[in-house]
Amino acid sequence: MIDMDEKLRILLCEDDENLGMLLREYLQAKGYSAELYPDGEAGFKAFLKNKYDLCVFDVMMPKKDGFTLAQEVRAANAEIPIIFLTAKTLKEDILEGFKIGADDYITKPFSMEELTFRIEAILRRVRGKKNKESNVYKIGKFTFDTQKQILAIGDKQTKLTTKESELLGLLCAHANEILQRDFALKTIWIDDNYFNARSMDVYITKLRKHLKDDDSIEIINIHGKGYKLITPEPES
């Protein structure tokens, strides 16, 4: 969990030395603590030794690419926000980043102001989550703790990523009602552009897999509108 009273500590991995130094200096000037590493291997070693609040990874790096690095980081910490920087603009590459669990994806060239905006947008979501009281939802045979981001059924507990938790929380708040697609996108992703919409589709697929142990639960598409979480009404 990010401590808002401490200086935000960013793990920055970028193999372009000039760009990396510019990014580090700019972020430090904005009040962040940014540590720069030239490849994914060095970045992961630093991640294991130190505590970071947010990661910014270039995709194409030597020794270990950004996608592989993100997967390893996610395995160790499902909550830490990750932003990808890349020159890749193919839809397949961008979707691959979101499948891994990226919180945002910025294509090069980009402005320093844009990166700062994306970081601040993520922080607003974290602050909002931190300020909310814990809600525990009963979803069929599942119990979902929004604060701990844990989905449980019987003795099985699944730790959800931040975006999985946020999206499932919205679906639970609108259980058996239509969750409007635009509302969900602007609430969680800030922007309802094409790539964010595809990212949300990926997370819906992940949530369906998490919920597959209870046949009474279903997330259905409502064409042109959004999604609906079908779940038995809780017993009174």
UniProtKB/Swiss-Prot annotation:
SMART domains: REC (SM00448), Trans_reg_C (SM00862). PROSITE patterns: OMPR_PHOB, RESPONSE_REGULATORY. It holds the Pfam family Response_reg. Phosphorylated by RprX. The keyword Hydrolase does not apply. Keywords: Cytoplasm, DNA-binding, Phosphoprotein, Transcription, Transcription regulation, Two-component regulatory system. GO terms for molecular function: phosphorelay response regulator activity; transcription cis-regulatory region binding. GO terms for cellular component: cytosol; protein-DNA complex. The modification 4-aspartylphosphate is found at residue 58. Residues 134-231 bind DNA. It is found in: Cytoplasm. Member of the two-component regulatory system RprX/RprY. This is Transcriptional regulatory protein RprY. It comes from Bacteroides fragilis (strain YCH46). The gene is rprY.
